A protein has these predicted regions:
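Histidine/acidic-residue-rich, glycine-tolerant segments that coordinate divalent metal ions
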Residues: 59, 80-82, 86-98, 104-105, ...
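Divalent metal-coordination and catalytic microenvironments
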Residues: 21, 60, 73, 103, ...
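Metal-dependent amide/peptide-bond hydrolase catalytic core
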Residues: 211-393
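Active-site pocket-shaping loop/turn-to-helix segments
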Residues: 24, 201-208, 263-269
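Non-cysteine beta-strand/loop elements that form the S-adenosyl-L-methionine
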Residues: 72-74, 186-188, 348-353
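Acidic/His- and Gly-rich active-site-bordering loop/insert found
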Residues: 2-99, 108-123
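Active-site beta-loop-alpha junctions enriched in small/polar residues
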Residues: 26, 76-78, 134, 164, ...
Length: 393
């Protein structure tokens, strides 16, 4: 029986697992039932299972043969604070939470690969199956690393995969170098002197200073970053005042910036600091600037050459050369798998969730993972393990 036929038999199981996880979404560091479900499945496959890294993380270990080669495969588990608007039977049962980024599918594909590999054992070495919490803005990968992930599971390399709605169903996209941008937040607090709206001359208007600052911030990329280097700075929140006839004392601005190099990241941070200081001084406004006040920023997701070559070989074996884009445009989105790639060589790859006009973008209340790609993704994981570790002697 061929690999694809075997995975097709697993397909119905993976669909059941995926839709179960979709019905019961759990957000960052609260994935207790999700982790238990995954751990129970891994144990039933005969894997050694460790729980608790990164609070709710799960790692399954499968060793075959006598080789000391090791590979780690990672899937994320967490959902988002989004109210699902789908009406199908497996829609979210948790109000205000849903799997709008496909992490239910990522977990199901990795579980399918774990089951197949545990039953067929056609490799020589050790596979670590990492199920990570809190990818969505809470840096769960970093927390697992801090808790000793790679000390306890000393892999040679680490690999990740994410569904992508803009790619045709079951095709892949991967390349060496930057795949996802770095991500940093900032918060600016401007403090002036409150006054009656009819008497602005008696106060210092923090709203006026904030307006000038917002406009100036948009010059950072357009007039300071080399046009050949992609970057974006966005103001995403403005908080000030509570009534019609008073100029408030305080304005709070929040935003993000994203790019693909440390040099550009440093330049943006420096220019932000410069603008905040000088514009607010010019308006006689006090100001503070804080970077990443709630969570760690994410580094660039950067694929290393040898590991990308392995991922590319596996993807081509699954989808054919015509089914693999080897020069995709990097995404301005961000991914905390980047923390793992700072610790170990590895590769992050996209699998197509479907590019038709009926497919939803990620983080959309109508999104649903495409179950058609479950067997394709699991097959990619299996091929990657067999290529990287080789057959047992």
């Amino acid at each position: 029986m061929t690999l694809s036929n075997t995975l097709e038999q697993l397909h119905s199981e993976m669909r059941q697992w995926r839709q179960h996880l979709h019905r019961f979404p759990e957000t960052a560091f609260e994935e207790t039932q999700t982790a238990e479900f995954i751990a129970d499945k891994l144990k039933s496959f005969g894997l050694e299972v460790h729980q608790g890294l990164g609070k709710t993380g799960v790692v399954g270990t499968l060793s075959v043969g006598d080789s000391d080669k090791k590979i780690a495969l990672r899937a994320d588990m967490d959902a988002l604070f989004i109210q699902e608007q789908n009406t199908f039977a497996h829609k979210s049962c948790h109000d205000g939470k849903m799997h709008a980024c496909g992490h239910d599918g990522h977990s199901a594909m990795l579980l399918g690969a774990a089951k197949y590999l545990s039953e067929n054992r056609n490799f020589n070495g050790t596979v670590y199956f990492i199920f990570q919490p809190a990818e969505e803005g809470r840096a769960g990968a970093q927390q697992m690393i801090t808790d000793g992930l790679f000390e306890q599971f000393p892999t040679d390399s680490v690999f990740g995969m994410h569904n992508f709605p803009d790619i045709p169903t079951g095709q892949f996209a991967v390349k060496t170098g930057a795949m996802m941008a770095s991500f940093d937040c900032f918060e600016i607090t401007l403090t002036g002197q409150a006054t009656h709206a009819a008497m602005p001359h008696l106060g210092n208007d923090a709203i006026l200073a904030a307006a000038q600052l917002i406009t100036a911030i948009q010059s950072i990329v357009s007039r300071n970053v080399n046009p050949a280097d992609a970057a974006v700075v966005s103001i995403t929140q403005i908080h000030a005042g509570s009534t019609w006839n008073a100029i408030p004392e305080t304005v709070v601005l929040r935003g993000t910036f994203r790019c693909f190099s440390l040099a550009v990241k440093s330049l943006i941070a420096d220019k932000l600091s410069h603008l905040v200081q000088h514009i607010c001084t010019g308006f006689d406004i006090k100001a503070t600037l804080e970077f990443n006040p709630e969570n760690a920023g994410y580094p660039v997701t950067f694929n290393t050459g040898p590991e990308t070559a392995l991922a590319l070989q596996a993807a081509i074996e699954v989808a054919g050369e015509e089914g693999v884009n080897t020069n995709p445009k990097p995404s301005m989105g961000s991914e905390d798998f980047a923390f793992m790639l700072q610790e170990k060589p590895g590769c992050y790859l996209w699998i197509g969730n479907g590019s038709s006009e009926n497919s939803c973008l990620l983080h959309n209340p109508h999104y649903d993972f495409n179950d058609e790609i479950l067997a394709i993704g699991a097959t990619y994981w299996i091929k990657l393990v067999e290529i990287t570790l080789g057959s047992k002697t």
